[in-house]
Protein backbone atom coordinates (compact mmCIF):
# COMPACT_ATOMS: atom_id res chain seq x y z
CA UNK A 1 0.00 0.00 0.00
CA UNK A 2 1.21 3.52 -0.82
CA UNK A 3 0.21 7.16 -0.47
CA UNK A 4 0.27 9.28 -3.60
CA UNK A 5 0.51 12.74 -5.15
CA UNK A 6 -1.60 14.14 -8.00
CA UNK A 7 -0.45 17.07 -10.12
CA UNK A 8 -2.66 18.95 -12.63
CA UNK A 9 -1.93 21.93 -14.87
CA UNK A 10 -2.93 23.82 -18.01
CA UNK A 11 -6.68 23.13 -17.96
CA UNK A 12 -7.90 26.72 -18.06
CA UNK A 13 -7.94 29.50 -20.65
CA UNK A 14 -8.44 33.28 -20.60
CA UNK A 15 -12.15 32.63 -21.17
CA UNK A 16 -12.98 29.58 -19.08
CA UNK A 17 -12.38 27.53 -15.97
CA UNK A 18 -9.50 27.38 -13.49
CA UNK A 19 -7.20 24.51 -12.56
CA UNK A 20 -7.68 25.31 -8.86
CA UNK A 21 -11.43 24.77 -9.32
CA UNK A 22 -10.77 21.24 -10.58
CA UNK A 23 -8.53 20.66 -7.55
CA UNK A 24 -11.26 21.91 -5.22
CA UNK A 25 -13.91 19.66 -6.76
CA UNK A 26 -11.47 16.74 -6.75
CA UNK A 27 -10.73 17.17 -3.04
CA UNK A 28 -14.44 17.37 -2.24
CA UNK A 29 -15.10 14.17 -4.18
CA UNK A 30 -12.11 12.33 -2.70
CA UNK A 31 -13.15 13.27 0.83
CA UNK A 32 -16.68 12.12 -0.03
CA UNK A 33 -15.19 8.74 -0.93
CA UNK A 34 -13.49 8.57 2.47
CA UNK A 35 -9.95 9.59 1.50
CA UNK A 36 -7.82 11.94 3.63
CA UNK A 37 -6.23 14.82 1.72
CA UNK A 38 -3.55 17.31 2.77
CA UNK A 39 -3.86 21.03 2.03
CA UNK A 40 -3.49 21.37 -1.77
CA UNK A 41 -0.68 23.37 -3.35
CA UNK A 42 -0.95 26.06 -6.02
CA UNK A 43 2.54 26.56 -7.40
CA UNK A 44 3.63 29.15 -9.97
CA UNK A 45 6.44 28.37 -12.35
CA UNK A 46 8.72 30.67 -14.42
CA UNK A 47 6.61 33.77 -15.24
CA UNK A 48 8.57 34.27 -18.49
CA UNK A 49 7.04 31.17 -20.13
CA UNK A 50 5.31 32.50 -23.25
CA UNK A 51 2.79 29.71 -23.77
CA UNK A 52 1.20 29.85 -20.30
CA UNK A 53 -2.61 29.97 -20.30
CA UNK A 54 -2.85 32.57 -17.53
CA UNK A 55 -0.60 32.56 -14.47
CA UNK A 56 1.59 29.53 -15.19
CA UNK A 57 0.47 27.73 -12.05
CA UNK A 58 -0.03 24.03 -11.38
CA UNK A 59 -1.83 22.33 -8.50
CA UNK A 60 -0.77 19.34 -6.40
CA UNK A 61 -2.83 17.13 -4.10
CA UNK A 62 -1.37 14.73 -1.53
CA UNK A 63 -3.50 11.71 -0.60
CA UNK A 64 -2.62 10.81 3.00
CA UNK A 65 -4.12 7.32 3.13
CA UNK A 66 -2.36 4.04 2.46
CA UNK A 67 -3.87 2.99 -0.88
CA UNK A 68 -4.55 -0.38 -2.44
CA UNK A 69 -4.33 -0.75 -6.24
CA UNK A 70 -8.12 -0.47 -6.56
CA UNK A 71 -8.03 2.80 -4.55
CA UNK A 72 -5.39 4.25 -6.84
CA UNK A 73 -7.45 3.33 -9.90
CA UNK A 74 -10.54 4.94 -8.39
CA UNK A 75 -8.61 8.15 -7.60
CA UNK A 76 -7.12 8.26 -11.10
CA UNK A 77 -10.54 7.80 -12.71
CA UNK A 78 -12.10 10.57 -10.60
CA UNK A 79 -9.20 12.89 -11.48
CA UNK A 80 -9.39 12.16 -15.21
CA UNK A 81 -13.17 12.62 -15.24
CA UNK A 82 -12.99 16.07 -13.61
CA UNK A 83 -10.10 17.24 -15.79
CA UNK A 84 -11.97 16.22 -18.93
CA UNK A 85 -15.18 17.88 -17.72
CA UNK A 86 -13.66 21.22 -16.65
CA UNK A 87 -10.97 21.85 -19.27
CA UNK A 88 -11.30 24.36 -22.11
CA UNK A 89 -10.13 22.01 -24.87
CA UNK A 90 -11.26 24.50 -27.52
CA UNK A 91 -8.53 26.98 -26.55
CA UNK A 92 -5.47 26.45 -28.73
CA UNK A 93 -3.12 27.32 -25.88
CA UNK A 94 -4.70 24.93 -23.36
CA UNK A 95 -2.74 21.66 -23.23
CA UNK A 96 -3.61 19.79 -20.01
CA UNK A 97 -1.49 17.30 -18.17
CA UNK A 98 -1.92 15.06 -15.12
CA UNK A 99 0.89 13.46 -13.12
CA UNK A 100 0.59 10.68 -10.53
CA UNK A 101 3.48 9.89 -8.19
CA UNK A 102 3.59 7.43 -5.30
CA UNK A 103 4.89 8.87 -2.05
CA UNK A 104 7.60 6.21 -1.83
CA UNK A 105 8.98 7.36 -5.20
CA UNK A 106 8.59 10.98 -4.08
CA UNK A 107 10.74 10.38 -0.99
CA UNK A 108 13.26 8.27 -2.88
CA UNK A 109 13.77 11.04 -5.48
CA UNK A 110 13.40 14.08 -3.22
CA UNK A 111 16.69 15.71 -4.27
CA UNK A 112 15.98 15.20 -7.97
CA UNK A 113 12.49 16.65 -7.56
CA UNK A 114 13.89 19.70 -5.75
CA UNK A 115 16.23 20.30 -8.68
CA UNK A 116 13.31 19.91 -11.09
CA UNK A 117 11.35 22.52 -9.12
CA UNK A 118 14.25 24.96 -9.40
CA UNK A 119 14.48 24.29 -13.13
CA UNK A 120 10.81 25.10 -13.78
CA UNK A 121 11.21 28.30 -11.76
CA UNK A 122 14.36 29.50 -13.53
CA UNK A 123 14.16 28.06 -17.05
CA UNK A 124 11.92 27.04 -19.94
CA UNK A 125 11.26 23.29 -19.70
CA UNK A 126 10.11 21.18 -22.66
CA UNK A 127 7.37 18.55 -22.59
CA UNK A 128 9.91 15.95 -23.67
CA UNK A 129 12.17 16.81 -20.73
CA UNK A 130 9.25 16.56 -18.29
CA UNK A 131 8.11 13.21 -19.76
CA UNK A 132 11.54 11.66 -19.35
CA UNK A 133 11.91 13.08 -15.86
CA UNK A 134 8.52 11.74 -14.71
CA UNK A 135 9.42 8.27 -15.93
CA UNK A 136 12.86 8.55 -14.34
CA UNK A 137 11.36 9.17 -10.88
CA UNK A 138 8.77 6.42 -11.33
CA UNK A 139 5.71 8.57 -11.98
CA UNK A 140 2.86 8.31 -14.48
CA UNK A 141 1.45 11.02 -16.71
CA UNK A 142 -1.55 11.69 -18.93
CA UNK A 143 -1.27 14.23 -21.75
CA UNK A 144 -4.05 15.98 -23.61
CA UNK A 145 -3.27 17.72 -26.90
CA UNK A 146 0.36 18.90 -26.60
CA UNK A 147 0.38 17.93 -22.93
CA UNK A 148 2.36 20.92 -21.66
CA UNK A 149 0.49 20.66 -18.39
CA UNK A 150 2.68 17.79 -17.22
CA UNK A 151 5.54 20.29 -16.79
CA UNK A 152 3.70 22.33 -14.17
CA UNK A 153 1.88 19.33 -12.71
CA UNK A 154 5.20 17.80 -11.67
CA UNK A 155 6.50 21.24 -10.69
CA UNK A 156 3.66 21.61 -8.19
CA UNK A 157 4.31 18.14 -6.75
CA UNK A 158 8.07 18.89 -6.53
CA UNK A 159 7.78 22.27 -4.79
CA UNK A 160 9.58 23.06 -1.54
CA UNK A 161 9.31 25.90 1.04
CA UNK A 162 9.02 28.83 1.45
CA UNK A 163 5.23 28.87 1.19
CA UNK A 164 2.45 31.37 1.65
CA UNK A 165 -1.30 30.71 1.42
CA UNK A 166 -4.19 31.73 -0.79
CA UNK A 167 -7.87 31.36 0.02
CA UNK A 168 -9.80 31.02 -3.23
CA UNK A 169 -13.55 31.59 -3.12
CA UNK A 170 -15.61 30.28 -6.05
CA UNK A 171 -18.80 31.56 -7.67
CA UNK A 172 -22.06 29.76 -8.21
CA UNK A 173 -22.23 28.43 -11.77
CA UNK A 174 -25.04 30.78 -12.75
CA UNK A 175 -22.72 33.71 -11.93
CA UNK A 176 -19.84 32.62 -14.16
CA UNK A 177 -19.08 35.25 -16.78
CA UNK A 178 -21.09 37.96 -15.02
CA UNK A 179 -19.59 41.05 -13.41
CA UNK A 180 -18.24 40.38 -9.93
CA UNK A 181 -19.93 42.45 -7.23
CA UNK A 182 -17.34 42.97 -4.50
CA UNK A 183 -17.65 45.90 -2.10
CA UNK A 184 -14.50 48.00 -2.43
CA UNK A 185 -14.77 49.50 1.04
CA UNK A 186 -14.91 46.05 2.65
CA UNK A 187 -11.73 45.02 0.79
CA UNK A 188 -9.90 48.10 2.06
CA UNK A 189 -11.09 47.50 5.63
CA UNK A 190 -10.08 43.83 5.44
CA UNK A 191 -6.66 44.80 4.10
CA UNK A 192 -6.00 47.29 6.89
CA UNK A 193 -7.24 44.93 9.62
CA UNK A 194 -5.14 41.97 8.45
CA UNK A 195 -1.93 43.83 7.45
CA UNK A 196 0.86 42.67 7.27
CA UNK A 197 -0.36 39.06 7.33
CA UNK A 198 -2.30 39.34 4.07
CA UNK A 199 -0.97 41.00 0.94
CA UNK A 200 -1.92 42.33 -2.49
CA UNK A 201 -5.56 42.93 -1.58
CA UNK A 202 -5.84 46.52 -2.81
CA UNK A 203 -3.73 48.93 -4.87
CA UNK A 204 -4.03 52.26 -3.06
CA UNK A 205 -1.99 54.18 -5.62
CA UNK A 206 -4.29 53.19 -8.48
CA UNK A 207 -7.46 52.62 -6.38
CA UNK A 208 -7.96 49.08 -7.62
CA UNK A 209 -9.23 45.87 -6.02
CA UNK A 210 -6.61 43.13 -6.46
CA UNK A 211 -8.36 40.09 -5.00
CA UNK A 212 -10.77 39.62 -7.94
CA UNK A 213 -9.63 38.20 -11.31
CA UNK A 214 -10.50 39.90 -14.58
CA UNK A 215 -11.39 36.70 -16.43
CA UNK A 216 -14.81 34.97 -16.60
CA UNK A 217 -13.50 32.04 -14.53
CA UNK A 218 -15.15 30.38 -11.51
CA UNK A 219 -13.04 32.34 -8.99
CA UNK A 220 -14.87 35.09 -7.11
CA UNK A 221 -11.84 36.32 -5.20
CA UNK A 222 -8.51 35.17 -3.81
CA UNK A 223 -6.93 36.44 -0.60
CA UNK A 224 -3.21 35.87 -0.08
CA UNK A 225 -1.40 35.73 3.22
CA UNK A 226 1.10 34.03 5.48
CA UNK A 227 -1.40 32.61 8.00
CA UNK A 228 -4.25 30.32 6.92
CA UNK A 229 -6.36 31.16 10.00
CA UNK A 230 -6.19 34.88 9.24
CA UNK A 231 -7.32 34.17 5.67
CA UNK A 232 -10.50 32.56 7.00
CA UNK A 233 -11.25 35.67 9.06
CA UNK A 234 -10.41 37.90 6.09
CA UNK A 235 -12.85 36.06 3.82
CA UNK A 236 -15.78 36.82 6.12
CA UNK A 237 -15.00 40.54 5.98
CA UNK A 238 -15.59 40.74 2.21
CA UNK A 239 -19.05 42.04 1.32
CA UNK A 240 -20.91 41.57 -1.96
CA UNK A 241 -21.53 38.43 -4.00
CA UNK A 242 -21.48 35.32 -1.82
CA UNK A 243 -19.21 32.41 -2.78
CA UNK A 244 -20.48 28.87 -3.29
CA UNK A 245 -17.37 27.18 -1.88
CA UNK A 246 -13.77 27.98 -0.99
CA UNK A 247 -10.42 26.26 -0.63
CA UNK A 248 -7.12 27.30 0.99
CA UNK A 249 -4.01 26.47 -1.03
CA UNK A 250 -0.40 26.40 0.04
CA UNK A 251 1.43 28.54 -2.56
CA UNK A 252 4.74 30.11 -3.53
CA UNK A 253 3.12 33.50 -4.15
CA UNK A 254 5.07 36.45 -2.82
CA UNK A 255 8.24 34.46 -2.13
CA UNK A 256 10.71 35.60 -4.84
CA UNK A 257 11.61 31.95 -5.48
CA UNK A 258 11.88 32.70 -9.20
CA UNK A 259 14.85 35.02 -8.56
CA UNK A 260 18.51 34.22 -7.90
CA UNK A 261 21.64 36.34 -7.54
CA UNK A 262 23.60 36.51 -10.79
CA UNK A 263 26.52 38.40 -12.30
CA UNK A 264 25.56 40.36 -15.39
CA UNK A 265 27.99 38.36 -17.53
CA UNK A 266 26.06 35.17 -16.67
CA UNK A 267 22.55 36.50 -17.32
CA UNK A 268 20.46 34.87 -20.04
CA UNK A 269 16.91 35.51 -21.30
CA UNK A 270 13.68 34.33 -19.66
CA UNK A 271 14.95 33.83 -16.13
CA UNK A 272 14.67 35.75 -12.85
CA UNK A 273 17.62 37.58 -11.31
CA UNK A 274 18.87 39.72 -8.46
CA UNK A 275 21.76 41.90 -9.63
CA UNK A 276 23.91 44.20 -7.48
CA UNK A 277 25.58 47.06 -9.31
CA UNK A 278 26.02 50.76 -9.95
CA UNK A 279 23.96 52.99 -12.17
CA UNK A 280 26.21 53.95 -15.10
CA UNK A 281 23.66 55.73 -17.30
CA UNK A 282 20.99 57.98 -15.86
CA UNK A 283 17.35 56.95 -16.31
CA UNK A 284 15.53 58.21 -19.39
CA UNK A 285 11.99 57.97 -20.66
CA UNK A 286 11.40 56.02 -23.85
CA UNK A 287 8.45 55.43 -26.15
CA UNK A 288 5.48 53.82 -24.45
CA UNK A 289 5.94 55.58 -21.12
CA UNK A 290 8.68 53.20 -19.95
CA UNK A 291 11.80 54.31 -18.04
CA UNK A 292 15.20 52.71 -18.68
CA UNK A 293 18.68 52.96 -17.15
CA UNK A 294 21.92 51.02 -17.39
CA UNK A 295 23.48 49.02 -14.54
CA UNK A 296 27.05 47.69 -14.21
CA UNK A 297 28.45 45.17 -11.73
CA UNK A 298 32.03 45.01 -13.02
CA UNK A 299 31.36 41.88 -15.07
CA UNK A 300 29.15 43.63 -17.61
CA UNK A 301 26.36 46.14 -18.19
CA UNK A 302 22.63 45.61 -18.68
CA UNK A 303 19.55 47.76 -19.30
CA UNK A 304 16.92 47.82 -16.54
CA UNK A 305 13.38 48.89 -17.34
CA UNK A 306 10.34 50.07 -15.38
CA UNK A 307 7.34 49.60 -17.64
CA UNK A 308 4.43 52.01 -17.97
CA UNK A 309 2.03 49.82 -15.92
CA UNK A 310 4.31 50.29 -12.89
CA UNK A 311 2.97 53.88 -12.77
CA UNK A 312 4.42 55.85 -9.82
CA UNK A 313 7.30 53.40 -9.39
CA UNK A 314 8.81 55.00 -12.50
CA UNK A 315 9.19 58.26 -10.56
CA UNK A 316 11.47 56.46 -8.10
CA UNK A 317 13.55 55.10 -10.97
CA UNK A 318 13.80 58.57 -12.54
CA UNK A 319 15.47 59.85 -9.35
CA UNK A 320 18.43 57.48 -9.62
CA UNK A 321 21.74 59.01 -10.71
CA UNK A 322 25.05 57.68 -11.98
CA UNK A 323 26.98 56.11 -9.11
CA UNK A 324 24.02 54.90 -7.05
CA UNK A 325 24.67 51.38 -5.75
CA UNK A 326 21.52 49.27 -5.92
CA UNK A 327 20.12 45.75 -6.23
CA UNK A 328 17.67 45.13 -9.06
CA UNK A 329 15.10 42.34 -8.73
CA UNK A 330 13.34 41.19 -11.89
CA UNK A 331 13.00 38.95 -14.91
CA UNK A 332 15.12 39.05 -18.05
CA UNK A 333 13.53 39.86 -21.39
CA UNK A 334 15.08 38.44 -24.54
CA UNK A 335 15.14 41.24 -27.12
CA UNK A 336 16.69 43.59 -26.38
CA UNK A 337 18.29 41.86 -23.41
CA UNK A 338 17.35 43.64 -20.21
CA UNK A 339 15.77 43.32 -16.76
CA UNK A 340 12.07 44.00 -16.22
CA UNK A 341 12.18 45.52 -12.74
CA UNK A 342 9.96 44.10 -9.98
CA UNK A 343 11.62 46.02 -7.17
CA UNK A 344 14.92 47.67 -6.27
CA UNK A 345 16.93 48.00 -3.09
CA UNK A 346 18.99 51.17 -2.80
CA UNK A 347 22.16 50.32 -0.89
CA UNK A 348 24.19 53.53 -1.24
CA UNK A 349 23.26 56.87 -2.74
CA UNK A 350 25.78 58.92 -4.68
CA UNK A 351 26.11 62.53 -3.58
CA UNK A 352 24.39 64.94 -5.96
CA UNK A 353 25.87 68.33 -6.81
CA UNK A 354 24.40 71.19 -8.82
CA UNK A 355 25.76 74.57 -9.89
CA UNK A 356 25.13 77.38 -7.42
CA UNK A 357 23.06 79.78 -9.52
CA UNK A 358 23.34 82.61 -6.98
CA UNK A 359 25.63 85.56 -7.67
CA UNK A 360 28.72 85.43 -5.40
CA UNK A 361 28.68 89.27 -5.20
CA UNK A 362 25.08 90.19 -4.48
CA UNK A 363 23.16 86.92 -4.17
CA UNK A 364 21.11 87.64 -7.26
CA UNK A 365 20.08 85.07 -9.86
CA UNK A 366 22.61 84.13 -12.55
CA UNK A 367 21.62 83.69 -16.17
CA UNK A 368 23.67 81.59 -18.60
CA UNK A 369 25.23 83.55 -21.47
CA UNK A 370 25.62 80.46 -23.64
CA UNK A 371 27.09 76.98 -23.54
CA UNK A 372 30.07 77.22 -21.14
CA UNK A 373 30.22 80.98 -21.86
CA UNK A 374 29.73 81.99 -18.27
CA UNK A 375 26.88 83.67 -16.41
CA UNK A 376 25.56 87.18 -15.89
CA UNK A 377 23.82 88.37 -12.74
CA UNK A 378 20.33 89.69 -13.41
CA UNK A 379 20.62 92.01 -10.41
CA UNK A 380 24.14 93.52 -10.35
CA UNK A 381 24.96 92.70 -14.01
CA UNK A 382 28.38 91.28 -13.15
CA UNK A 383 29.76 88.43 -15.26
CA UNK A 384 31.04 85.22 -13.71
CA UNK A 385 33.18 82.74 -15.67
CA UNK A 386 31.80 79.24 -16.22
CA UNK A 387 34.53 77.54 -14.15
CA UNK A 388 34.08 80.01 -11.27
CA UNK A 389 30.61 78.73 -10.47
CA UNK A 390 30.56 76.78 -7.21
CA UNK A 391 29.05 73.30 -7.00
CA UNK A 392 26.77 72.73 -4.02
CA UNK A 393 25.47 69.43 -2.67
CA UNK A 394 21.70 68.97 -2.74
CA UNK A 395 19.64 66.56 -0.70
CA UNK A 396 18.51 63.45 -2.56
CA UNK A 397 14.77 62.79 -2.68
CA UNK A 398 15.48 59.10 -2.07
CA UNK A 399 16.52 56.99 0.90
CA UNK A 400 18.26 53.63 1.14
CA UNK A 401 15.98 50.62 1.28
CA UNK A 402 13.42 48.82 -0.88
CA UNK A 403 11.10 50.33 -3.49
CA UNK A 404 8.52 48.21 -5.32
CA UNK A 405 6.01 48.32 -8.16
CA UNK A 406 2.33 48.80 -7.18
CA UNK A 407 0.31 45.69 -6.42
CA UNK A 408 -1.57 45.88 -9.72
CA UNK A 409 1.75 45.48 -11.59
CA UNK A 410 3.25 42.82 -9.33
CA UNK A 411 3.85 39.26 -10.51
CA UNK A 412 2.38 36.36 -8.52
CA UNK A 413 5.82 35.27 -7.32
CA UNK A 414 7.25 38.70 -6.46
CA UNK A 415 7.71 39.29 -2.75
CA UNK A 416 6.05 42.48 -1.49
CA UNK A 417 8.22 44.63 0.77
CA UNK A 418 5.88 43.97 3.70
CA UNK A 419 6.93 40.30 3.65
CA UNK A 420 10.70 40.86 3.50
CA UNK A 421 11.21 40.10 7.20
CA UNK A 422 8.21 37.78 7.61
CA UNK A 423 9.05 34.87 5.28
From Swiss-Prot:
Q: What class of enzyme is it?
A: ligase
Q: Report the record's Gene Ontology biological process terms.
A: tRNA wobble cytosine modification
Name the Enzyme Commission number(s) assigned to this protein. Answer: 6.3.4.22
Name the InterPro entries for this protein.
NA-bd_OB-fold, NA-bd_OB_tRNA, TiaS-like_TCKD, TiaS_FLD, tRNA_Ile2__agm2C_synt, Zn_ribbon_TiaS
Q: What does this protein do?
A: ATP-dependent agmatine transferase that catalyzes the formation of 2-agmatinylcytidine (agm2C) at the wobble position (C34) of tRNA(Ile2), converting the codon specificity from AUG to AUA.
For this chain, the family text in UniProt reads: Belongs to the TiaS family.
Q: What is this protein called?
A: tRNA(Ile2) 2-agmatinylcytidine synthetase TiaS
User: Could you read off the lineage of the organism from its UniProt record?
Assistant: Archaea, Methanobacteriati, Methanobacteriota, Methanomada group, Methanococci
Amino acid sequence: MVMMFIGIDDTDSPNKYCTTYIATLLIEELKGCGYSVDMPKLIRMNPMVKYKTRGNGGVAIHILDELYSKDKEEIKNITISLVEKYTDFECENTNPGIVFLDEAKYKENREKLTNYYKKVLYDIVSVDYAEKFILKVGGEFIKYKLGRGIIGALGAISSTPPYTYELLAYRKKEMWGKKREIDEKSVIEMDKETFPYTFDNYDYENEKILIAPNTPCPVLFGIRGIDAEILLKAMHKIEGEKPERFMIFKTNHGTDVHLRKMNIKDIYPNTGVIVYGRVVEEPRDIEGGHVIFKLSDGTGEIDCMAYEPTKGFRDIIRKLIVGDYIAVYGTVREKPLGINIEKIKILKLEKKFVKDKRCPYCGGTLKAKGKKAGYKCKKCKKTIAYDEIKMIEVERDLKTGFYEVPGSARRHLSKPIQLIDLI
